[in-house]
Amino acid sequence: MIKQRTPKKVIQATGVGLHSGEKVLLTLRPAPVNTGIVFRRVDLSPVVEIPASYEYVGDTMLCTTLHHGKVKIATVEHLLSALAGLGIDNAYIDVNAPEIPIMDGSAAPFVFLIQSAGIREQNAAKRYIRILKPIRVEENGKYVQFLPHKGYKITFTIGFEHPVFNDRPQTVSFDFSGTSYVKEVCRARTFGFLSDYEKLRECDLAKGGSLDNAIVVDDYRVLNEDGLRFESEFVTHKVLDAIGDLYLLGSSLIGAFEGYKSGHELNNRLLRELMVRQDAWEYTYFDTENYLPAVHPEYYPVEA
């Protein structure tokens, strides 16, 4: 049986919020079986819980933001990506601010945090969503789609006519039956254009944004002194984002996802379209260790 997983112990990290620029304390806690991933605004009284579910997604302008009434938690996608990549099914995530810290702009610090906490298997079967029929959402020349597939595969294409992008890969495809999320995906940082950051600052946003937590591009070049971590870092970050957004289904996927110039909004619309098309998917479980159709097949050692 492929079992559910949770962090082994409580662990904390601090960072700055991308938009507020304020210090954020994040606490990762173990959770019982079938809890799912639950965010908790512990700076509020009473504490407000927001499940990591596509149904709670509100704003998708610059990141994925979860809403529960007037309470929100923004920039959840990188942490969710790390949780998905390490196969964590159940966890409480306490934050004392309305956004998850941006860290270095990738999911790698969250992967390190989870690995440091350790991972424990739980006595319940892990649930998967298997894609049975193609589902597609498109708008203004952009699209996202699910396709049936025996494992988990993500293909993404960006399309920037820009000197920095023209000489680098703008399409990548990862089949996670043979790809390591930790080694090949989680280190890809978020990116943006200097002109956009200047506009955001004028709107009192991105106050925590810097060259320490994003790749910044001007009209001709990458401004970060150390450059890119690898040549396909731009488009690979879009895969990282998609893995986090798709984990808002509340289960790991068995199927293929394709994104073409898409972002958080289309990703969420695809999840909503999938869930109302009940003939296009099914829940499934695995009672054998011989087949691990998950985001990250190289599961880290766990303790029961």
Curated annotation (Swiss-Prot):
Main function: Catalyzes the hydrolysis of UDP-3-O-myristoyl-N-acetylglucosamine to form UDP-3-O-myristoylglucosamine and acetate, the committed step in lipid A biosynthesis.
Cofactor: Zn(2+)
Catalytic machinery residues: H264
Catalytic activities: a UDP-3-O-[(3R)-3-hydroxyacyl]-N-acetyl-alpha-D-glucosamine + H2O = a UDP-3-O-[(3R)-3-hydroxyacyl]-alpha-D-glucosamine + acetate
Phylogenetic placement of the source organism: Bacteria, Pseudomonadati, Pseudomonadota, Gammaproteobacteria, Legionellales
Family recorded in the similarity comment: Belongs to the LpxC family.
The protein, known as: UDP-3-O-acyl-N-acetylglucosamine deacetylase
Pathway(s) where this gene product acts: Glycolipid biosynthesis; lipid IV(A) biosynthesis; lipid IV(A) from (3R)-3-hydroxytetradecanoyl-[acyl-carrier-protein] and UDP-N-acetyl-alpha-D-glucosamine: step 2/6
GO biological processes: lipid A biosynthetic process
Transmembrane segments: none
